[in-house]
Amino acid sequence: MEKKVALIIGAGDSLGSSIARVFAKDGFTIVAARRNGSELDKLKKEIVSQNGKCHSYSLDARKEEDVTKFIEKIEKDIGQISVAVYNIGANIKYNIIETTSQKYYKVWEMAAFGAFLMGREVAKHMVPRKEGTIIFTGATASVRGKEGFAAFSGAKHAKRALAQSMARELGPKGIHVAHVVI
C-alpha cells in the first residue's frame, strides 16, 4: 500500500494535469481520473518517466454508485487517500433565455454534484483517520456571476458553499477542506 495518495478527479489537459505533476514531484502516488481515462496516458507516462507513480482511470463523477465504488477501490487497492482534488468545471457559455433546464442541470451536476459525491466519499475514509485534505478548484465565477454563464456561475457558487460547509464540519475532525479560486 502506498503511503501518500493524491486523487485528482478532473485531471484534464491543463490544470488537473498540472496539479497531478506537483503532487507527484512531492512523492505522492497519483490517482488521476476523468471521463475518458485513456486521455490520461500521456500524463501517466510523464509521471512514471520521472520515477513517480500514477494510476489512471475513467470515471463519470456524476454517477453516485461509480464514485462510491471508485473511492473504495482506491482505498483498498492503492492506499489511503491523503489528498483529494475535485477539478471538474463545465465552463460553458449559455444565454439564460436559451438555456434549457437539461443544460443547466448538466453543468450543475458536473461542477457541484460530482464535488459533493467525491467530498462525501473521501470524508468517510478520512474522518476515522482524523487526517486528510479535500480541495475543490474554483473560478472567479465562484464569487460573481457573468453574462452568459448563469449555469456555470450557479454551479461554481454551489461548489464554494459546499466547500465552506464541509470545512466547518470536518475541520474539527482533522480534515482540511479548501476551495481555491484559480
Residue ranges and their predicted role:
Residues 12-13:
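Conserved glycine-rich cofactor-binding loop
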Residues 28-42:
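Conserved glycine-rich Rossmann-like NAD(P)H-binding loop of the short-chain dehydrogenase/reductase
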Residues 3-4, 80-81, 126-139, 172-175:
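Active-site loop of short-chain dehydrogenase/reductase
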Residues 119-120, 164:
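A short, exposed helix-loop element centered on a Lys and neighboring polar residues
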Residues 95-96, 103-108:
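Substrate-binding pocket helix/loop in short-chain dehydrogenase/reductase
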Residues 133-158, 164, 168-171:
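Catalytic loop of short-chain dehydrogenase/reductase
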Residues 47-65:
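Rossmann-fold cofactor-recognition segment
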